[in-house]
Amino acid sequence: MLSAGTLIHGGVMVNYRCTAACRHCLYSCSPTRGSGYVDKETAENICRLLRTGGCRSVHIGGGEPFLDFDGLLAVIRLLRKAGITLEYIETNAFWADSNAPEKKGVQDKLKHLLSEGAGTLCISVDPYHAEYVPYGAPLALAELCEKTGVDYFLWKREFLPVLSRLDSKKVHSRDEMEKTFSDTYIYDTARSYGIGYGGRAVNIEREFSTGLDGALYPAEKFITDTAPCHNLLSTGHFHVDMYSYFIPPRCTGIRIPLSEAVDGIPGGKYPVFEALYSGGISALFKLAREQGFSPDEAGYPSKCNLCFHLRHFLSEKNYSELDRNHYEEALRYYS
């Protein structure tokens, strides 16, 4: 049976709900995703499987982990109990916004994190997040981290000179930022980030492909490629979601139970996964065509973009390895 082998480095996604729906979000998180948070039993099982798979350190992400602070603390404690090092916790800093009800208790939360041994935050700050969180909030959180002794890093600090042209106390629309920066700030930000065009970012690749990055190509250009997609079991930067699904790096929207990624994947159980893993885009296209897929006559900017749309189509056919919500949410918010 196939398995992921040693789990080298990963993240635990404690939820999918977020206060933002960023254009580059690989996991298609948003304010309208389910409001649940990983429960204790699932988190305990995740920790056990991570240990079994050889993983000794993780970060915590989402969604937005700080939407349920008590739930976050519970996960931190379980990781510590399992002997798994917590590297950092990701946040968009919404809870440090001067207008947020949570603002009053920020320092108390930071001190609580320190007491639990969770001493580092990864604080998001960039033009995409600025559509949903005033960029002053990450800066305010960073300042409070310094006062309380919590380590942090701004992801990505390089955008601060650009953002300084905006009002730090309010969010900004695409139209505002295009007028302030340029008509191509979305594409320029993606290039500066070095992002992969998965999740909601498939829209960035498609919108700007003809103008800046080549052209749209017919599906026929890509479907003869039989190279297997072994990235589906890559463990260099995998994630485990709140339902204990293993999610490979970059190829989001595909999921298999973490227990099977660790112990072995039964043959024949996941046709979409097996098609991609063994026969690449060619095999996946064949599977989709058999079920009625018609390629977009306008074309696709890349093989991976075509793959996303093939999986989106197949996600409506009840394949358990495909997260239908991921594809719907990826296409829902981009405008």
What residue spans do the PLM features occupy?
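Canonical Radical SAM [4Fe-4S] cluster-binding loop centered on the CxxxCxxC motif
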Residues: 2-40
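Core AdoMet radical
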Residues: 9, 29-38, 55-68, 84-104, ...
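Iron-sulfur (Fe-S) cluster-binding segments and ferredoxin-like electron-carrier domains
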Residues: 27-36, 310-325
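Short cysteine/histidine-rich metal-coordination sites, predominantly Zn2+-binding motifs
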Residues: 37-46, 319-332
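Acidic (Asp/Glu)-rich catalytic clusters
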Residues: 49-52, 80-81, 108-117, 141-144
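Distinct, well-ordered alpha-helical segments
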Residues: 72-75, 98-111, 165-173
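Classical nucleotidyltransferase
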Residues: 125-231, 235, 240-241
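Accessory C-terminal segments flanking Radical SAM cores
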Residues: 191-315
